[in-house]
């Protein structure tokens, strides 16, 4: 320490060559070193001794008062000090921005701002003249102590009786000194002397050198150099007191000084005006040129801070041998020089310093006058204070002052008088002394609080650095949402007792331990009970029953009196230790009449009870003789509470004895270790037997896990039914009980923690009631618990949420049954209060070795070397004990499970399934649709009943009359991940069943199981834990991409895609991004089963939902996939950002199908997830069929895309799936599957349907009807008049009509009243399209729906509705076989070939040997003049027109306008038929129409395709046919077509022959009949 002190001594005491001293100085200095405190202490030492030190004040140099060592002292105290200061003969002028005027109070913030501006605006010349601030001038002390420079902030250095000497070096050989001698007068004597090598007498060497200087040249040089303006640094010197009175006096003045410096004093408006007028004087100080070189060479930073040194200790200084100075300088010239020196030094202070000095003078008016120079009183005072004797000075009568210096001194005297007047004005505005003291106390309190806050933040930082980074054994990373249980307030308050006072009064206690396999699950070793579908549910129910039972045994809570256990439960808590997670209970004997100890029966455990207490034996026998079912007497009440639920979780528990679940420990230190040991500040992540997919271990779950702290009061704890019901609801809602602790808080402490406390906790009777602290953990735990608990007011809860806990068990608002933090800001505080550790007063505690696994594979030496810096630097913790302290809050590692959805659940509910899983906190990591075999079901541990449901077979027979309803064969497989996943699977299944019931989907499921009364959850869902072998047996990776090499080349080539919106289209939907995937189930639910109607499509589809073809979840997309999926083009600006977003986020991709799929899906996306203002859309749909095909080929394989017959809206209007295989003659015995890729390329197949025009409709409107048929893109492949029988009529009647016999008879009478015209139409989706354009059966409903529907135009009533259309695909095939048994006129068709419908190649009526004859209709004869039949004129004729094939093939077909032209010319059609001729028939027909003329050409024309035969009647229809057609407009194209291209008879006999050859019947209103 001596060497260090020597380093701080000034150059004079270290033997500097420029300093001459004697042994007297050295002896004085050596005597004082022992009393001087060390100045080299670091910050850490200061922080450790904060209570022992008194930190007065610290401020930057610009805001401190310079040189307050004189102003703070009284005149008497000034007499006890000799302040020696070296001053230059020139002054450096300070600017107003650097130093406030002595007459104006300037705020400190303004001073600092002005100082910064001044420093920034310095010019290089000024820095060269004065590169070092004034406070860096070398200081010397007569006792040998030098102020040390600050190294790391302001350092308070204490030393005694320091006299500062500011010594500028003029040159290497000459030193000068100015001494200020405060005497009994107010005048100060200015003297100059040179330092000599002798202790007595002063050398005149300095004065001799001074006489040789040219002061005029020196002043001129200083004016040119523009010296930088600076403020004299402050220096508060320590005072050495000899009495207690003086010690208190200096303390009061220091407090006053600190208060004035810390608070801004408002200035007077008059002073502000004077400052603006420039009346404030400026002080200046200029060093010598040689002094500037000394400062430049000192090497100190210009902005370094000075050290404020105070010595508040009352130490006794040692007298040293010093040189004596003359006490009565009588030389007048010396007094004048001192007076000039006083004026020179006076302006070196700020206004505040001068103000303080004047105030000291006013307060000490009682002291002796400043002009007195009584040497005896001075000498006596110095002896009392122990001040060294002053050195004598030689008279300086020979020294002459230059005229310029005298002028300067005169100016300063004038300025000094003005300053004194201004100081008197300022004194009246000073605050009172009491206010200064209160502000000082407030400042000290704030400083203390700030230090405590910083210390606690450092503690938090150290705890964060040592936080566990993984699970207890390092298998997985630390669970999320596990904050450090540290709070700046609660962690320093006293801990809450976990045992009552009676447990510490010497009563016998036992430790009951119940091992837990995970949070909320009891570990039962050697469990061999009956096989259960939900083994985890049994373990959870066991935990609920045990916890409720132990709570019911707590004294003060047990009010029901139904307990027969021989013990009380005093303490209860769930804690993790190195041995694992367990529920601990402290047992004590009951305070009732002593029971006789039962005899120990002879059994195997008898040896274990020897040497134990009777209490231990009673408890042990009770546990071994009772089961859990026998002690839960309230179980039936809990079952009654669950009756209102649709699918409540069962509450059964395994029939095991309590001794197989719990163990006893009679050691006294066992209870002490569990309930009295200091708990830790960290969560621990418990490891279970669950596994996760290693390929997906790096993908975060992002499950929004939250924690809730709940305090259960005595009213709830005393009701076992209520508490057990609460635990059951927590399990049902998917929350983990991660912390349980029974506490005994004091009444006043409990009121300070909780706002509203029940009245039973007032503590008036001296009894401390317990509370139970629960910590709940799960996804959105705060929201879920708020719904479970309900509103705080029980009356309001009963109105708004009758199933909440407050509604069922609450009493009144002022008597709560529970408390939980409703504000998220209080969560950490409450967790730290109830479950966190405490910081001891010493600040040293054990946190154990939190990450031992990370160094278990390294040598011990390597482990020590690899320790992080945070662990090395922590001094408050002891990690020598590698055992981790108990953790009262635990989380579980992540686990994967397979959820299998049976085929009985419709695919339209898959969105609901995904949404419930995500809502319950399960993260989605894979999807697949697959068929289960018996082997796979066995690996999934399914029961025999489940196998028959999850592995259905194909039905063997189907009726042709009903639509093909092939059952769903594929299951839906999901890979889910969650903390403690196996524990929550039972609650997940229960939530899924409730969701299906609320959506109304259980009816469809129950219809498939007609042999059962209720739908069991096991029929719909099955859960299996994840294993790698199970994943491989289920088809391998769920994220496998298709192999593009297996795709046929013709699929990848350029080709047209079916894009008709009326057909079924396949579209690919992509959901990308974590935020989007959280709502993926909701989006899919609205798409598959929409509740809002989408805009009506042109097809008028009867179902608005989509058919789900494929689902796939991918952890990320490849760049090739992202380029196909992005909605932007390459030239778009956001294209690149969209690609990066897609490849860096998981995605869920769906393949969907329905009619007009692209337009409907785009409209749905706009409603669900608007993209306005979003750079990355949440939902991306493929824009065209070609893009959809490319996206599907990159993502799905042909096995991944599976059609869903039950959810396909158009299933009954399309052929069955295996139609192609049946056409080829091959069929798989397990059923055929549709290739979606083939469907996307070829589109839907061409179908056929039957349109039946009912009697008296088609004869007058056939042309218009055929025109409408052509408008809807139908192709006519068959047409013939048919006469219906009763059997035929019943075949085409609707099902609701068949139920009424009278209504059925009415329909049959109408249908048999005349021939109907049957038309067979061809197009894609023909069946559904025809039903769409026909409309409802009732024409009135048609007109209300759309007036352009066909039945609305041609129907008159529900019976005479005009038309009939095939109602399904199977009905269409049946109608074709009924009305067209001879076949149809079609090209090659796979559907008709599969349905065995022949192709018509020749006409079945045209024959040369036909015996049919055409005769006049008797009903139209002249003997019946009153008949209402039309066309009864004698001139009426019937013609037979033949439309050749070329008129039917072209588009638009010319035959339709020709028929309309006939209708316009009042022709009445009596028969029409579409037929085809072979070669012989064509020759016969050609000869009939034009015998001998162009026979060969006509034969060729007739055999090119189908021909249309039409029988029409009118007056002169045969003889005047050309003139009738051209009568109005000869330029009409339809008329020209009829005359030029249509074949017509020339004579009436020829026409009659044709009618008998081509038709077998005519309409009843025809003038002719065909006789057979």
From Swiss-Prot:
Disruption phenotype: Mutant multiciliated cells show a severe loss of ODAs from motile cilia. Interacts with DNAI2. The keyword Cell inner membrane does not apply. Residues 1-21, 262-304, 324-428, 849-871 are annotated as: Disordered. Residues 336-351, 409-426 have a biased composition (Basic and acidic residues). The gene is dnaaf8. GO terms for cellular component: axonemal microtubule; dynein axonemal particle. GO terms for biological process: outer dynein arm assembly. One of its GO terms (molecular function) is dynein complex binding. It comes from the Eukaryota. It is found in: Dynein axonemal particle; Cytoplasm. Residues 324-335, 361-374, 849-865 have a biased composition (Polar residues). This is Dynein axonemal assembly factor 8. Expression is enriched in multiciliated cells in the epidermis and the nephrostomes of the pronephros. PANTHER family: DYNEIN AXONEMAL ASSEMBLY FACTOR 8, NUCLEOSIDE DIPHOSPHATE KINASE 7. Keywords: Cytoplasm. It comes from Xenopus laevis. In cyliated cells, dynein axonemal particle-specific protein required for deployment of ODA to the axoneme. Interacts with outer dynein arm (ODA) subunits. The lineage of its organism: Eukaryota, Metazoa, Chordata, Craniata, Vertebrata. Coiled coil: none annotated. Gene3D superfamilies: Nucleoside diphosphate kinase-like domain. Residues 1249-1382 are annotated as: NDK.
């Amino acid at each position: 320490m001596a060497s260090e002190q020597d380093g701080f001594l000034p150059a004079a005491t270290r033997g500097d060559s420029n300093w001459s001293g004697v042994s007297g100085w050295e002896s004085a200095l050596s005597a004082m070193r022992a009393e001087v405190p060390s100045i080299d202490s670091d910050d850490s030492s200061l922080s450790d001794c904060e209570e022992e030190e008194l930190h007065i004040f610290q401020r930057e140099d610009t805001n401190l008062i310079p040189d307050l060592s004189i102003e703070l002292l009284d005149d008497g105290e000034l007499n006890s000090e000799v302040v020696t200061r070296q001053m230059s003969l020139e002054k450096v002028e300070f600017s107003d921005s650097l130093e406030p005027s002595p007459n104006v109070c300037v705020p400190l913030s303004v001073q600092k701002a002005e100082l910064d501006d001044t420093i920034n605006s310095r010019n290089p010349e000024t820095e060269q003249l004065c590169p070092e601030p004034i406070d860096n001038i070398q200081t010397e002390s007569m006792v040998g102590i030098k102020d040390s420079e600050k190294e790391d902030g302001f350092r308070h250095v204490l030393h005694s009786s320091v006299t500062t000497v500011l010594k500028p070096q003029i040159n290497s050989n000459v030193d000068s000194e100015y001494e200020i001698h405060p005497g009994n007068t107010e005048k100060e004597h200015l003297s100059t002397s040179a330092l000599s090598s002798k202790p007595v007498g002063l050398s005149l060497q300095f004065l001799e050198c001074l006489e040789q200087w040219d002061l005029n040249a020196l002043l001129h040089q200083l004016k040119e150099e523009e010296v930088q303006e600076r403020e004299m640094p402050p220096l508060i010197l320590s005072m050495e007191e000899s009495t207690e009175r003086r010690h208190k006096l200096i303390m009061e003045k220091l407090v006053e000084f600190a208060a004035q410096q810390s608070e801004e004093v408002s200035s007077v408006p008059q002073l502000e005006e004077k400052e603006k007028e420039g009346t404030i004087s400026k002080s200046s100080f200029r060093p010598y040129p040689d002094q500037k070189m000394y400062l430049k060479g000192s090497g100190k930073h210009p902005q370094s801070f000075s050290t404020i040194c105070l010595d508040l200790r009352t130490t006794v200084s040692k007298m040293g041998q010093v040189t004596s100075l003359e006490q009565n300088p009588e030389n007048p010239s010396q007094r004048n020089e001192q007076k000039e020196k006083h004026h020179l030094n006076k302006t070196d202070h700020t206004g505040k310093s001068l103000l303080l000095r004047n105030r000291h003078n006013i307060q000490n008016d009682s002291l002796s006058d400043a002009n007195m120079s009584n040497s005896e009183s001075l000498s006596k005072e110095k002896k009392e204070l122990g001040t060294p004797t002053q050195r004598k000075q030689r008279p300086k009568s020979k020294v002459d002052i230059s005229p310029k210096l005298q002028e300067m001194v005169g100016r300063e005297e004038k300025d000094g008088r003005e300053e004194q007047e201004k100081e008197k004005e300022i004194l009246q505005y000073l605050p009172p002394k009491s206010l200064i003291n209160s502000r000082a106390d407030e400042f000290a309190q704030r400083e203390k609080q700030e230090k405590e806050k910083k210390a606690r933040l450092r503690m938090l930082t150290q705890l964060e650095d040592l936080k566990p980074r993984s699970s207890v054994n390092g298998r997985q990373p630390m669970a999320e949402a596990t904050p450090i249980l540290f709070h700046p307030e609660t962690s320093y308050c006293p801990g809450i007792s976990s045992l009552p006072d009676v447990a510490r009064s010497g009563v016998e206690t036992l430790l009951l331990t119940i091992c837990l396999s995970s949070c909320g699950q009891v570990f039962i070793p050697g469990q061999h009970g009956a096989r259960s579908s939900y083994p985890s549910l049994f373990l959870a129910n066991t935990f609920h029953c045990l916890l409720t039972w132990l709570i019911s045994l707590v004294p003060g809570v047990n009010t029901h009196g139904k307990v027969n256990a021989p013990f009380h439960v005093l303490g209860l808590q769930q804690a993790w230790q190195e041995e694992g997670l367990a529920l601990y209970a402290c047992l004590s004997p009951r305070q009732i009449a002593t029971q006789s100890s039962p005899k120990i029966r002879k059994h195997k455990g008898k040896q274990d009870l020897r040497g134990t207490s009777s209490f231990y034996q009673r408890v042990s026998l009770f546990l071994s003789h009772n089961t859990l079912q026998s002690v839960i007497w309230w179980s039936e009440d809990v079952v009654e509470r669950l009756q209102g639920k649709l699918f409540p979780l069962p509450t059964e528990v395994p029939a095991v004895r309590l001794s197989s679940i719990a163990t006893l420990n009679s050691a006294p230190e066992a209870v002490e270790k569990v309930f009295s040991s200091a708990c830790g500040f960290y969560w621990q992540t418990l490891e279970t037997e669950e596994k996760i997919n290693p390929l997906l271990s790096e993908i975060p779950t992002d499950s929004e896990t939250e924690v809730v702290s709940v305090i259960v009061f005595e009213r709830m704890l005393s009701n076992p039914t209520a508490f057990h019901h609460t635990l059951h609801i927590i399990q049902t809602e998917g929350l983990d009980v991660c912390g349980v602790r029974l506490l005994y808080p004091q009444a006043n402490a409990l009121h300070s923690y909780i706002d509203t406390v029940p009245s039973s906790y007032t503590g008036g009777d001296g009894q401390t009631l317990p509370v139970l602290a629960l910590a709940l953990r799960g996804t959105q735990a705060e929201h879920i618990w708020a719904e479970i608990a309900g509103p705080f007011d029980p009356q309001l809860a009963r109105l708004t949420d009758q199933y909440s806990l407050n509604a069922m068990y609450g009493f009144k608002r002022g008597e709560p049954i529970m408390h939980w933090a409703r504000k998220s800001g209080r969560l950490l505080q409450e967790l730290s209060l109830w479950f966190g550790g405490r910081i001891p007063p010493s600040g040293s505690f054990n946190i154990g070795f939190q990450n031992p696994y990370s160094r278990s594979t390294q040598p011990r030496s390597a482990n020590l070397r690899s320790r992080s810096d945070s662990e090395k630097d922590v001094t408050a913790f002891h990690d020598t004990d590698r055992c981790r302290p108990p953790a009262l809050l635990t989380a579980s590692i992540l686990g994967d499970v397979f959820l299998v959805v049976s085929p009985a659940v419709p695919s339209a509910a898959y969105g609901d399934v995904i949404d419930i899983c995500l809502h319950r906190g399960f993260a989605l990591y894979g999807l697949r649709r697959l068929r289960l075999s018996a082997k796979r079901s066995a690996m999934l541990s399914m029961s025999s009943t489940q196998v028959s449901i999850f592995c259905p077979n194909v039905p063997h027979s189907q009726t042709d009359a009903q639509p093909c309803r092939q059952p769903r064969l594929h299951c839906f497989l999901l890979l889910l991940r969650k903390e403690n996943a196996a524990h929550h699977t039972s609650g997940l299944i229960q939530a899924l069943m409730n969701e299906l019931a609320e959506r109304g989907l259980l009816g469809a499921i129950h219809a498939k199981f007609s042999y059962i009364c209720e739908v069991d959850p096991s029929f719909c869902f099955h859960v299996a834990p994840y294993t790698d072998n199970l994943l491989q047996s289920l088809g391998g990776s769920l994220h496998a991409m298709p192999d593009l090499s297996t795709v046929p080349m013709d699929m990848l080539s350029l080709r047209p895609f079916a894009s008709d919106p009326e057909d079924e289209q396949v579209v690919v939907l992509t959901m990308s991004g974590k935020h989007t995937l959280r709502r993926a189930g909701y989006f899919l639910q609205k798409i598959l089963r929409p509740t809002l109607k989408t805009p009506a499509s042109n097809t008028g589809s009867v179902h608005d939902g989509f058919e789900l073809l494929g689902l796939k979840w991918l952890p990320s997309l490849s760049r090739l996939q992202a380029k196909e999926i992005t909605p932007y083009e390459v030239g778009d600006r956001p294209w690149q950002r969209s690609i990066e977003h897609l490849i860096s986020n998981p995605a869920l991709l769906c393949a969907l199908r329905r009619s007009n799929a692209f337009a409907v899906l785009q409209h749905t996306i706009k409603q669900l997830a608007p993209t306005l203002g979003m750079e990355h859309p949440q939902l991306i749909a493929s824009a065209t069929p070609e893009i959809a095909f490319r996206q599907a080929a990159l993502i799905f394989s042909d096995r991944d895309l599976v059609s869903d017959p039950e959810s396909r809206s158009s299933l009954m209007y399309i052929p069955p799936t295996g139609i192609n295989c049946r056409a080829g003659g091959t069929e798989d015995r397990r059923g055929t599957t549709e290739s979606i890729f083939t469907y996307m390329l070829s589109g839907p197949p061409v179908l056929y349907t039957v349109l039946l025009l009912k009697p008296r409709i088609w004869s007058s409107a056939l042309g218009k009807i055929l025109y409408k048929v052509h408008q809807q893109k139908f192709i006519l492949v068959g047409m013939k008049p048919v006469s219906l029988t009763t059997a035929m009529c019943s075949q085409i009647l609707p099902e609701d009509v068949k139920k009424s016999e009278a209504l059925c008879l009415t329909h049959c009478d109408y249908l048999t009243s005349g021939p109907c015209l049957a038309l067979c139409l061809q197009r894609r989706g023909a069946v559904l399209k025809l039903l769409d354009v026909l409309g409802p059966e009732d024409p009135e409903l048609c007109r209300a729906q759309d007036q352009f529907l066909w039945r609305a135009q041609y129907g008159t009533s529900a019976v005479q509705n005009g038309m009939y259309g095939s109602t399904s695909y199977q009905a269409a095939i049946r109608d074709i076989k009924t009305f067209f048994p001879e076949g149809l006129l079609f090209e090659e068709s796979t559907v008709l070939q599969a349905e065995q419908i022949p192709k018509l190649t020749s006409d079945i009526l045209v024959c040369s040997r036909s015996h049919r004859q055409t005769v006049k209709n008797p009903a139209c004869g002249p003997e019946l003049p009153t008949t209402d039949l039309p066309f009864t004129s004698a001139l009426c004729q019937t013609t037979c027109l033949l439309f050749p094939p070329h008129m039917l093939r072209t588009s638009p077909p010319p035959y339709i306008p020709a028929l309309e032209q006939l209708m316009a010319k009042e022709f009445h059609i009596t028969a029409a038929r579409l037929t085809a001729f072979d070669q012989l028939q064509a020759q016969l027909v050609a000869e009939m129409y034009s015998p001998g003329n162009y026979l060969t050409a006509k034969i060729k024309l007739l055999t090119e395709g189908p021909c249309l035969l039409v029988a029409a009647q009118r007056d002169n229809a045969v003889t005047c046919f050309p003139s009738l057609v051209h009568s109005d407009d000869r330029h009409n194209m339809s008329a020209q077509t009829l005359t030029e291209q249509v074949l017509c008879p020339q004579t009436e006999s020829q026409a009659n022959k044709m009618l008998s050859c081509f038709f077998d019947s005519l309409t009843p209103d025809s003038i002719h009949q065909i006789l057979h």
